[in-house]
Amino acid sequence: MGPGEDSSTLSVLRPATSGAASHRAPVEAFPPVYRVFRDAAGVLLRGWFDLRVEGVERLPLAGPFILAANHHNYLDGVVLGVAVPRPIAFLVMPRVFRATPLHPPFHRRIGSIPVALERPDPGAIKRVLEVLHAGRVVGIFPEGPFSQDGRLVRGRSGAAMVALRAGVPVVPAAIEGTYEALRGRRFYLPRRRPLAVRFGEPIHFGRARRGPIARTEREEITRRIMSEIAALLRVHPGPAAAAGRAGAS
């Protein structure tokens, strides 16, 4: 982001307000498809995979925020969708959004936002800002594509940029067990493994920003987000994982 932004993207921004409290709104209802899928997945994850959720009390009950989590595979979104008591608009890569003919209508019905990683995507960022200013939750995996070895990898700066542009907090989240559940599995059928997700305290970065945002600032905020995720995973992020890089998710 940054170079790919245009006036239509920035026009989404409303006058700056202080903190999530100014965005308070009634908790939004789950879209019907989202609710049915979430209920079914919840029974499976809690019963078969013994899903444990820690820190859910740290999640804002209303108002917009960005949920930033580590990323192993498709199960991560399912785990977060079950654990978070509000609907999440996830950023997804186009190839995931259109993986099969059934994927696009499914993703549209649950509110997913396709975003390109290899180039600036101001249209996607505009949609993200619209979702946030509607008081909703956006889910971003700062690492971008799936981790290939289950370890935390370097974060992209998209979550930091969106947080600064929208003036909303970032809630870090750490997901455990999904990599082991799908490692080496055919047909995407997970093996039985305990799953866990931990939520950290919301990180606030101040009021919405309209002007240019320095790359060094985006990278510093990305390092903080990745460090918080690493702390929840109880691992050291290392210089590669903590460093920021350009990208929308």
Protein language model regions, located:
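Short, basic, glycine/proline-bearing loop/turn elements
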Residues: A40-G42, R109-V115, P142-F146
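Conserved beta-strand scaffold positions in the cores of enzyme catalytic domains, especially
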Residues: V53, F90, S112-P114, V170, ...
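A secondary-structure boundary/capping signal
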Residues: G55, N70, V92-M93, F141-P142, ...
